[in-house]
Amino acid sequence: MAKLTKRMRVIRDKVEVTKEYEINEAVALLKELATAKFVESVDVAVNLGIDARKSDQNVRGATVLPHGTGRDIRVAVFTQGANAEAAKAAGADIVGMEDLAEQVKKGEMNFDVVVASPDAMRVVGQLGTILGPRGLMPNPKVGTVTPNVAEAVKNAKAGQVRYRNDKNGIIHTTIGKASFEANQLQENLEALLVALKKAKPSSAKGTFLKKVSISTTMGAGVTVDQASLDTQAN
């Protein structure tokens, strides 16, 4: 049997696997256990009441978290003309068309999000095998293929998170850093859950948000009592 590290022993002793923690208690516990030498991310896993095998029940979208993610997001934009100037003014890091496509083909991809105007998809479409596996392919469902590229850039820079369920019907994404204030993490989580509820497929029956767990990069998952959250849409 593998020997538990000191960190793993502390987590085992502190976290009750079967317990649902109120959000303030859950966040306090994560912060206490976030002892890595770097600032850990706070991640969330949401088990959805969907049949992921059915395409009409899959959930995909994006939402801007009120307190961002704590990451400095680099945005590349495929567009031209006035849209290119608007993208630069909005804070885009790289803007181009064929020239940007050539960079991508060479493996020069120093960016986290790719945005494209509809007229640029003739260029971006050729990059699917490169951008797709990296989760960078622009998609209208998450607002990254849009005529309003400036807004998409601002959203990405402001801390927009994209989400889609995996084959087990679970959403995995980030809601910030362990260095965030407790209320910031709570409000980010609540904003994400509100967005997910709005994205509930009409064909999904029964309880939609079945389980919500939060964890840090190096820590254990803590299940959150949803009754301690405000997930009513305004």
Curated annotation (Swiss-Prot):
Q: Name one GO biological process term.
A: regulation of translation
Q: Which GO terms describe its molecular function?
A: rRNA binding; structural constituent of ribosome; tRNA binding
InterPro entries noted in UniProt: Ribosom_uL1_bac-type (IPR005878), Ribosomal_uL1 (IPR002143), Ribosomal_uL1-like (IPR023674), Ribosomal_uL1/biogenesis (IPR028364), Ribosomal_uL1_3-a/b-sand (IPR016095), Ribosomal_uL1_CS (IPR023673)
Q: Which PROSITE patterns match?
A: RIBOSOMAL_L1
Matching Gene3D superfamilies, A to Z?
3.30.190.20, 3.40.50.790
SUPFAM superfamilies from the xrefs? Ribosomal protein L1
Q: Which domain of life is it from?
A: Bacteria
Example of a GO cellular component annotation carried by this entry: cytosolic large ribosomal subunit
Keywords tagged on the record: Repressor, Ribonucleoprotein, Ribosomal protein, RNA-binding, rRNA-binding, Translation regulation, tRNA-binding
Q: How does it assemble?
A: Part of the 50S ribosomal subunit.
Stated family: Belongs to the universal ribosomal protein uL1 family.
The UniProt function text for this chain reads: Binds directly to 23S rRNA. The L1 stalk is quite mobile in the ribosome, and is involved in E site tRNA release.
Protein name as catalogued: Large ribosomal subunit protein uL1
Annotated source species: Vibrio atlanticus (strain LGP32)
Q: Which gene encodes it?
A: rplA
